[in-house]
């Protein structure tokens, strides 16, 4: 909602969210459309194994051991986006290349 308010006032708002269900993503997309505000979905398609390797807090290990429940990708489902405007994969480039791709789609 904050991103929608910012975008409505002309600010490019970037929100990094875990949105595990298509229904939630569709709801946000529809809210933007209803407000006449552009919406760009970027799917950072990273395998769970890579996420685990990059996890500095050990949250994936805690989820796998059962100490954390409802953890997306481990013991709670994740519905991968099928209609994202941009899909980024770790194997396709580094963080700088991905940032450039995002900026290009936001500022055509």
Sequence positions of predicted segments:
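Generic structural signal for well-ordered alpha-helical scaffold segments
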Residues: 1-4, 103, 107
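Small-molecule kinase domains that catalyze NTP-dependent phosphoryl transfer to phosphate-bearing small molecules
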Residues: 45-101, 108
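ATP-dependent NMP and nucleoside kinases share a basic, alpha-helical "lid"
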Residues: 1-64, 70
């Amino acid at each position: 909602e904050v991103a929608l308010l910012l975008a409505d006032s002309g600010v490019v708002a970037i929100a990094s969210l875990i949105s595990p269900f298509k229904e939630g993503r569709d709801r946000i997309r529809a809210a933007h459309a209803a407000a006449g505000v552009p919406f760009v979905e970027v799917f950072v398609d990273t395998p769970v194994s890579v996420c685990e390797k990059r996890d500095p807090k050990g949250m994936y290990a805690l989820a796998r051991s059962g100490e954390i429940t409802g953890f997306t990708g481990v013991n709670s489902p994740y519905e991968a986006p099928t209609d994202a405007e941009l899909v980024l994969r770790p194997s396709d480039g580094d963080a700088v290349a991905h940032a450039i791709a995002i900026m290009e789609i936001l500022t055509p």
